[in-house]
Amino acid sequence: AHPDSVAACVLWSLAIQQAITTAEPDQVFDWEAAVRNGLGHIVEDRRQRWDGLITEAVTGPPGMFNPNGYVVTAFQAALSAIINTPVPAEQPSDHLRDALVAAVRIGHDTDTVAAIAGALLGARWGAGAIPDEWNTLIHGERRRDSEPVTGTELEQLARRAVGA
């Protein structure tokens, strides 16, 4: 695998782990720190490069990372959308919805950027933050000729997979 792909996966996976294990519902979550905390786990000669890439994502507007079909710019687009989307004071978990919409609005490889952002946002805010209307629209495909899997079934499968 390309070193950038490995580094991006390590950084994002560790940020997801941190969101799951440390994020408190009523406290601010430091998205940037969660991603930067993984720098010590990537190959040493890539750390400075990725530190700079994270800085670009944190300081640059989401639209700066288009086109984003490459792992680095997709990573930056997802992080930028998350960080640059305000967390609503009244309903903080609406940040998941708002940041995903921001990620998609960047354009280009929208499904990839939204999937990357959604993994970290979901880890932080939980399945309950997914808007009900989105769950009714989501469908998957079964392996053989049969009816599509509904959003509700996908949610049940996910909950069973994590033992919830």
Model-derived segments and spans:
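Catalytic phosphate/nucleotide-handling subdomain of diverse soluble enzymes
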Residues: 1, 11-17, 73, 77-164
